[in-house]
Amino acid sequence: MDFSGIYEDQQFWRGKEVSRVEARDIPGTNCYCDAEAAKVIRQRMAPYLPEGIHFIDSGNYHYISKFWTDKIKTPFSLVVFDHHPDMQPSLFDNLMSCGCWVKKVLDTNPYLQKVCIVGAAEKLIKALHPNYGEN
């Protein structure tokens, strides 16, 4: 998924059988995703299955992982490699951010069984709301 042009100078994908989702023309996506942008992104993702490896631009867009997990219709566990747990409450209901997407998946996806966060500081994990401690 290309939101910023990050892949233009990259070679790892060239000559391979890959599908690219062009998203540079979608406003309202950098670090935060508004409702209109989410609608357009979901439409562009619609033809693709959740299975596989998905390159999601830079860390400014890793909230897109929620849209991929929304497509999973069987029980699953989510492993997140990040320095932050990304489980903060959203400041605005109609915006998703890099800081709240894991919480939104936990709150809305009935197939999600467990989340494992690798790399976040222990103090950030301990600061999570107690309802999320076992998940």
Language-model regions, residue ranges each:
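Conserved alpha-helical scaffold segments that buttress catalytic/binding sites
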Residues: 1-135
